């Protein structure tokens, strides 16, 4: 049995220490280097470790933004336990419930759950999505007949970068139908891809 892994993954050496901090309910000072912006120290109450797309993420309460955030382990440059600060426990349900409305790990709290409808023009893509849905809410609305009579599917999620990335894999064989703001954002990304590659 083989599992997908990334042997060159940076930051996994922090996994054990972060897991122990979660179990021990310890407050951490994390040295974090975001993809955009300067490296900084963040006071963090760790709750959960999650893997997505061969990458590990630490979920917890970020004191700076007063909200739950996730930090990619490969961007954590170091951490230490902070004494004298009371640990703030997670007050929600289980983490399966927390992530149920998203593809991946990014939850944009200001973005509501939406029904994304799309057409599938290719039989291989249609069959692939039926047997390997990218989210548990993916539903078939109309079966595939031909490229002229495509399938219609829908997924009920909070739109985020990971959803767009998954749909871009199939961009040559699908058409986003609704909602229009998501459709326009998706089209803008496709136009940018074309501009970069012409």
Language-model features: locations:
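Short acidic/polar, Gly/Pro-enriched loop/turn segments located at secondary-structure boundaries
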Residues: 35-37
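Flexible linker/loop signature enriched in Pro/Ser/Thr and Pro/Gly
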Residues: 65-98
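Polybasic (Lys/Arg-rich)
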Residues: 100-198
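Well-ordered beta-strand positions
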Residues: 50-51, 168
């Amino acid at each position: 049995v083989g599992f997908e892994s990334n042997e060159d993954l940076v930051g996994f050496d922090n996994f054990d220490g972060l897991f122990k901090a979660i179990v021990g309910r310890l407050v951490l000072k994390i040295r974090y280097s975001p993809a955009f912006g300067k490296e900084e120290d963040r006071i963090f109450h760790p709750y959960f470790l999650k893997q997505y797309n061969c990458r590990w993420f630490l979920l917890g309460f970020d004191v700076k933004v007063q909200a739950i955030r996730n930090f990619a382990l490969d961007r954590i440059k170091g951490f230490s336990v902070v004494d004298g600060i009371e640990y703030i426990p997670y007050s929600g349900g289980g983490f399966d419930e927390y992530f149920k409305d998203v593809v991946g790990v990014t939850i944009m709290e200001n973005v509501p759950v939406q029904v994304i409808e799309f057409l599938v023009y290719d039989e291989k893509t249609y069959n692939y999505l039926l047997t390997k849905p990218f989210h548990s809410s993916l539903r078939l609305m109309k079966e595939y007949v031909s490229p002229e009579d495509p399938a219609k599917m829908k997924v009920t999620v909070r739109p985020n970068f990971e959803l767009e990335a998954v749909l871009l894999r199939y961009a040559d064989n699908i058409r986003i139908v609704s909602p229009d703001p998501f459709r326009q954002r998706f089209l803008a990304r496709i136009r940018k891809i074309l501009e970069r590659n012409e």
